């Protein structure tokens, strides 16, 4: 069977629960069946003339818009080290990789290892966040290893511990310990956020510029309720056309979401009015 990523690269969107799909630009309908070996056979092949680079996936601008204005209060909401991911919408590595569609070409690292290590792009410069612990890093340099930096700065992340094991994390902590600490409430509003580079010896000021503020205990005064934030994100995932069903189709190139029932009837994005080149069915947890 074709995966959603395969259909996305082919500029094809789903037409429902049956094994049918349609090229959103030229319109020929596809169907497929499986033989005894489980292999899929195509009956028609569309030819999308879109100049958009389909290898660069798009994400919902509504959801990313919620992630961009990350204040210190939001970061101290306590989602980091709970047993559940802070942003389950990014649980899929494919969706995390899709968030790097506007990843700067000057960044010192490719998106694939970042997505594999649990990070998604926030849409700002080379800033990334872990979907599970909410830890953020930036200022990536050539030769940086995402797993190593994840273990260095956010060693209590459960996704990291399950993926790489406690021995790996302890080894990284032993060889590259964090030196110094600071009180988040004393940090200036315009402080530079994270970098995975090794911290300078014993300087809280330099450390402050090298890491996104690590979430603190949820009981700290002024901390926002994590569950309320997630509830608001769920509300953002409601289709803006019918205002009823949950979104499940993402438009290319704009990245906005609508539901499966509304998508086939649209030629322009109802949110930004950009012509729709293609659509892809998404599966959000």
Swiss-Prot record:
Biased composition (Basic and acidic residues): 19-47
Positions annotated as BIR repeat: 96-161
Catalysed reactions, semicolon-separated: S-ubiquitinyl-[E2 ubiquitin-conjugating enzyme]-L-cysteine + [acceptor protein]-L-lysine = [E2 ubiquitin-conjugating enzyme]-L-cysteine + N(6)-ubiquitinyl-[acceptor protein]-L-lysine
Top-level lineage group: Eukaryota
Free-text description of this protein's post-translational modifications in UniProt: Autoubiquitinated and undergoes proteasome-mediated degradation.
GO biological process, any: regulation of natural killer cell apoptotic process
Listed EC numbers: 2.3.2.27
UniProt keyword annotations, A-Z: Apoptosis, Cytoplasm, Golgi apparatus, Metal-binding, Nucleus, Protease inhibitor, Thiol protease inhibitor, Transferase, Ubl conjugation, Ubl conjugation pathway, Zinc, Zinc-finger
CDD domains, per database record: BIR, RING-HC_BIRC2_3_7
Location, primary (coarse class): nucleus
GO MF annotations in UniProt: cysteine-type endopeptidase inhibitor activity; ubiquitin-protein transferase activity; zinc ion binding
Annotated binding of Zn(2+), by residue: 130, 133, 150, 157
Keyword Lipid metabolism applies: no
Chain intervals annotated as zinc finger (RING-type): 239-273
Quaternary structure and partners: Binds to caspase-9. Interaction with DIABLO/SMAC via the BIR domain disrupts binding to caspase-9 and apoptotic suppressor activity. Interacts with TAB1. In vitro, interacts with caspase-3 and caspase-7 via its BIR domain.
Family membership noted in the UniProt record: Belongs to the IAP family.
Function (record text): Apoptotic regulator capable of exerting proapoptotic and anti-apoptotic activities and plays crucial roles in apoptosis, cell proliferation, and cell cycle control. Its anti-apoptotic activity is mediated through the inhibition of CASP3, CASP7 and CASP9, as well as by its E3 ubiquitin-protein ligase activity. As it is a weak caspase inhibitor, its anti-apoptotic activity is thought to be due to its ability to ubiquitinate DIABLO/SMAC targeting it for degradation thereby promoting cell survival.
Record remark on domains: The RING domain is essential for autoubiquitination.
Name of the protein: Baculoviral IAP repeat-containing protein 7
Organism of origin: Mus musculus (Mouse)
Annotated gene: Birc7
């Amino acid at each position: 069977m074709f995966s959603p990523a395969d259909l996305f690269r082919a500029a094809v969107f789903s037409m429902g629960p049956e094994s049918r799909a349609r090229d959103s630009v030229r319109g020929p309908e596809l169907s497929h069946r499986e033989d005894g070996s489980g292999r899929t056979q195509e009956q028609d092949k569309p030819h999308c003339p879109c100049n958009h680079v389909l290898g660069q996936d798009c994400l919902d601008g509504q959801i990313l818009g919620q992630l961009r204005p990350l204040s210190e209060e939001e970061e101290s909401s306590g989602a980091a080290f709970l047993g559940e991911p802070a942003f389950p919408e990014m649980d899929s590595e494919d969706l995390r990789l899709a968030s790097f569609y506007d990843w700067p070409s000057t960044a010192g690292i490719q998106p694939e290892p970042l997505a594999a290590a649990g990070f998604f792009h926030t849409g700002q410069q080379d800033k990334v966040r872990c979907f599970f612990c909410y830890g953020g890093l930036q200022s990536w340099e050539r030769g940086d290893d995402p797993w190593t930096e994840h273990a260095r700065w956010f060693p209590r992340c459960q996704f990291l511990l399950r993926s790489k094991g406690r021995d790996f994390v302890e080894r990284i902590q032993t060889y590259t310990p964090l030196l110094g600490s600071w009180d988040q409430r004393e940090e200036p509003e315009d402080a530079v956020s994270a970098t995975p580079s090794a911290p300078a010896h014993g300087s809280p000021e330099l450390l402050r510029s090298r890491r996104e503020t690590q979430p603190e205990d949820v009981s700290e005064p002024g901390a926002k309720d994590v569950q309320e934030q997630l509830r608001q994100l769920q509300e953002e995932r409601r289709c803006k056309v019918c205002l009823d069903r949950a979104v499940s189709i993402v438009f290319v190139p704009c990245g906005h979401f609508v539901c499966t029932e509304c998508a086939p009837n649209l030629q322009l994005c109802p949110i930004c009015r950009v012509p729709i080149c293609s659509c892809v069915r998404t599966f959000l947890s």
